[in-house]
Regions:
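N-terminal prepro-regions of secreted/extracellular proteins
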Residues: 1-53
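Post-signal peptide N-terminal regions of Sec-secreted extracellular proteins
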Residues: 36-143
């Protein structure tokens, strides 16, 4: 699976807690509570001109509210992601200009009950390529 294929636009993927599986396999789990899991949500850039669909992506891992901006294409453009907590929250940006198959990461530190909004675009030579921008998408902060 290529780096680009591993990105799923607007999808969520469960990330199971490995400790529970290990304890069960080792026969040491006496009682079981709810399994802790995180969700990973993705938004991706749109195609425009020579830029491919999903050339850039922004990901939210709900356990710890980690946000990543990833470059999925060797097209020469960087990726800029925008995020905010709540629909009226302050807009923050996270730029990744390190090239294909790289990500930049930040901890959003949002309350579990809030919603995090994500938007991602390509940026070429300091200029945002607005035709590649995703729409704002909203995801729950807590797992």
């Amino acid at each position: 699976v290529s780096f680009l294929q591993s990105r799923l636009s607007g999808k969520r993927r469960p990330v199971a807690a490995a400790g529970v599986a290990f304890a069960v396999a080792a026969g040491t789990l006496v009682t079981a509570g709810p399994a802790s899991a995180a969700e990973i949500y993705d938004v991706t850039t749109k195609p425009s001109g020579s830029y491919l669909s999903a050339a850039g992506s922004m990901n939210l891992a709900t356990y710890g509210e980690h946000i990543s901006t990833c470059d999925n294409s060797s097209d020469g453009a960087g990726v800029i992601g925008y995020w905010k907590v709540g629909s009226g929250g302050t807009v923050h940006s996270l730029y990744n200009g390190k090239g294909r198959a790289t990500c930049e990461d930040v901890n959003a530190s949002a309350p579990e009950s809030s919603r995090i909004y994500l938007k991602v675009c390509l940026r070429n030579n300091g200029t945002v390529v607005s035709a590649t921008c995703s729409a704002w998408e909203s995801f729950p902060a807590g797992a």
